[in-house]
């Protein structure tokens, strides 16, 4: 018996037994020995058996060394152990001593067979496998012991190969590389065959259940037939589906595609089944599986439509720490944060208004141009953006989707609805620094500040009364003068719209219109032009303050003074705070002049703080 020591691949014999390893012979030496007559061979074998009575010691390093012997072995060439010729008998003892000196662990094997082994062990363990007994030595050695050694070594060889497949790697190209590739190919083939067998059995059971359900629906006319078919399919799906590796294996994909094609061909060939619609096996299995559905795509790949996959939608994982709002991307959360920080890094270069996003600034820039391509079909009013036109169309339709929960008042726009809700909260966060009056909205405070600096940009054409807001002017004309809410109904010069656009933006820039010759931005024409006061009538000298006034209208008025176009009182009848120009310059009162300077300083301070 041959035992393997726990130190690795070094075999050893049990205690009390003396064994000897047969010498490894080259093919040339074996062919030379076979040409001799049987008598010489038997004589040489008897001599060799007598010489091998001593124990043989060698190491695994000696075995793993490459064979440097030439094809024709001369007598003086040293060999590890050779008993082929009689000329080597004299040099056997020094070679044995040299082998014993190089030995790291003793190996003692007893065997009398010299013929090569019929079994080819192409690995690092082939040196330990003794060959079968020849007919000449069968009478000397006992066949049962040799067969036992052969069987043990063979089984041990296969066991080591199964436990240590990486031992196919050998230094100096001693082991065959093709054996490792063959082993890997066989392993992959066995795995694929096992998966294919599992898949085929599952497909067969599924087809059987589907055939049973189809036969029930075809043969039975009772309404319970469909319920029985669904129950059968659900029972077949109660068994766990294929493993994830089987679903991704190419064998499983090809089998599923072939089964689907066969089912389609069967449905096309059978004319009696054309009237009923039967789902294919792939679709039935997909519909029965609710948690994770997989269906083959037309390109042959498997599309995962599970809720957590990319096709099913990304989970929202980014939440705002301030308000708790959840976003599906970090970019959206970054865009949302300026709502809480109040940062408005994108500033308009024309009016100085700030915005949180660059896209909002781009939309805002349109109002500074004269382009209004979007026109209302009902009233003919034009707008810069289509969204503004859509919001305006709600006025004609009477659609007010935003309704207050407290008072039931409806609004066309969401912004107006939010501003109205602040009136019910009771909180007035915007307070005037001059009179300590508080407001719910910031734009109400902005309009209130005009009362302190005597700025009323919106003036009535009938009575010349000034207003801070265009809304107040429309309300005044509608109630007092019984004129429509839209100022366009009046016969006004075309520069009125320009003046209205200018005065609407005047509070935003403190430096606009300070001097009569200063250029100010004009939103309607896109150019720089001096501010135009529409309420100023023509001068008595024949020069007009507004080029829009025709000279014919100038000539028909007397040169003695101003004459209002609508037949109202002349400008000297109006108070000093009127928007009309006076012919005779009045001497300002010292107290009024001091009050005016104080109001001007307050307005500059307010504008510096707000804007």
UniProtKB/Swiss-Prot annotation:
C2H2-type zinc finger segments: 318-340, 346-368, 374-396, 402-424, 430-452, 458-481
Compositional bias (Acidic residues): 86-98
A GO CC annotation given for this chain: neuronal cell body
A molecular-function term among this protein's GO annotations: zinc ion binding
Keywords assigned by UniProt, alphabetized: Developmental protein, Metal-binding, Neurogenesis, Nucleus, Repeat, Repressor, Transcription, Transcription regulation, Zinc, Zinc-finger
Origin: domain of life: Eukaryota
Feature: compositional bias, Low complexity: 30-47, 283-298, 305-314, 581-602
Free-text disruption phenotype from the record: Results in abnormal expansion of type II neuroblasts and in ectopic expression of pnt and grh. Simultaneous RNAi-mediated knockdown of N partially restores normal neuroblast numbers and prevents loss of pnt expression. Simultaneous RNAi-mediated knockdown of erm with either HDAC3 or members of the Brm-associated protein (BAP) chromatin-remodeling complex brm and Snr1 further increases the number of type II neuroblasts compared with the single knockdown. Simultaneous RNAi-mediated knockdown of both erm and the ETS protein pnt restores normal neuroblast numbers.
UniProt similarity note: Belongs to the krueppel C2H2-type zinc-finger protein family.
Subunit structure: Found in a probable chromatin remodeling Brahma-associated proteins (BAP) complex composed of at least brm, Bap60, Snr1 and erm. Within the complex, interacts (via N-terminus) with Bap60 and HDAC3.
Purpose: Zinc-finger transcriptional repressor. In larval brain, involved in the maintenance of cell fate of intermediate neural progenitors (INPs) that derive from type II neuroblasts. Restricts INP developmental potential and dedifferentiation by interacting with HDAC3 and the chromatin remodeling Brahma-associated protein (BAP) complex. Restricts INP proliferation by regulating neuroblast specific factors such as prospero, pnt and grh, and by antagonizing the function of self-renewal factors, such as klu, dpn and E(spl)mgamma-HLH.
Name listed for the protein in its UniProt record: Fez family zinc finger protein erm
Organism encoding this protein: Drosophila melanogaster (Fruit fly)
Gene transcribed to yield this protein: erm
């Amino acid at each position: 018996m041959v035992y393997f020591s726990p130190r690795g691949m070094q075999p050893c014999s049990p205690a009390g037994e003396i064994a000897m390893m047969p010498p490894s012979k080259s093919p040339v030496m074996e062919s030379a020995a076979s040409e001799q007559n049987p008598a010489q061979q038997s004589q040489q074998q008897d001599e060799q058996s007598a010489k091998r009575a001593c124990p043989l010691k060698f190491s695994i390093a000696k075995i793993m060394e490459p064979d440097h012997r030439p094809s024709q072995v001369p007598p003086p060439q040293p060999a590890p152990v050779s008993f082929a010729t009689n000329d080597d008998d004299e040099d056997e003892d020094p070679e044995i001593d040299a082998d014993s000196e190089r030995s790291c662990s003793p190996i003692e094997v007893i065997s009398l067979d010299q013929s090569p082994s019929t079994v080819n062990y192409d690995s690092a363990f082939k040196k330990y496998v003794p060959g079968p007994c020849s007919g000449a030595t069968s009478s000397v050695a006992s066949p049962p012991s040799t067969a036992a050694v052969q069987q043990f070594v063979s089984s041990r060889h296969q066991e080591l190969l199964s436990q240590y497949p990486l031992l196919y790697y050998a230094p100096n190209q001693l082991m065959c590389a093709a054996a490792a590739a063959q082993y890997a190919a066989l392993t992959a083939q066995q795995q694929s065959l096992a998966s294919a067998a599992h898949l085929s059995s599952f497909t067969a059971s599924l087809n059987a259940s589907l055939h049973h359900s189809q036969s029930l629906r075809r043969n039975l006319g009772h309404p319970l037939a469909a319920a029985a078919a669904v129950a059968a399919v659900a029972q077949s799906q109660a068994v766990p589906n294929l493993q994830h590796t089987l679903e991704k294996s190419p064998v499983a994909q090809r089998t599923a595609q072939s089964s689907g094609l066969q089912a389609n061909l069967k449905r096309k060939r059978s004319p009696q089944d054309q009237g009923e619609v039967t789902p294919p096996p792939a679709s039935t299995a997909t519909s029965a599986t609710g948690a994770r559905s997989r269906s083959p795509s037309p390109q042959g790949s498997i599309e995962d439509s599970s809720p957590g996959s990319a096709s099913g939608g990304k989970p929202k994982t980014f939440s705002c720490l301030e308000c708790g709002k959840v976003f599906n991307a970090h970019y959206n959360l970054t865009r949302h944060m300026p709502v809480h920080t109040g940062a408005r890094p994108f500033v308009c270069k024309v009016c100085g208004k700030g915005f949180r996003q660059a896209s909002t600034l781009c939309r805002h820039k349109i109002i500074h141009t004269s382009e209004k391509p979007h026109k209302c079909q009902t009233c003919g009013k034009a707008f810069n953006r289509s969204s503004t036109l859509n919001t305006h169309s709600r006025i004609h339709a009477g659609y007010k989707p935003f309704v207050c929960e407290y008072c039931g008042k409806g609004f066309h726009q969401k912004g107006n609805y939010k501003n109205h809700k602040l009136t019910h909260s009771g909180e007035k966060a915007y307070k005037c620094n001059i009179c300590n009056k508080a407001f719910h909205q910031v734009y109400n405070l902005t309009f209130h500040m005009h009362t302190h600096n005597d700025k009323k940009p919106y003036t009535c054409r009938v009575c010349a009364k000034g207003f801070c807001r265009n809304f107040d002017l429309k309300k005044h004309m509608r109630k007092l003068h019984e004129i429509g809410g839209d100022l366009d109904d009046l016969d006004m010069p075309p520069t009125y719209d320009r003046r209205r656009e200018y005065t609407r933006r005047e509070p935003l820039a403190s430096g606009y219109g300070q001097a009569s010759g200063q250029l100010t931005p004009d939103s309607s024409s896109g150019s720089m032009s001096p501010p135009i006061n529409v309420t100023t009538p023509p001068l008595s000298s024949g020069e007009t303050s507004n080029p829009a006034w025709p000279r014919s209208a100038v000539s028909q008025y007397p040169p003695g003074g101003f004459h209002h176009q609508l037949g109202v009182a002349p400008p000297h009848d109006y108070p000093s705070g009127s928007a009309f120009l006076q012919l005779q310059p009045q001497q300002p009162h010292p107290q009024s002049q001091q009050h005016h300077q104080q109001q001007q300083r307050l307005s500059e301070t307010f504008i510096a703080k707000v804007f």
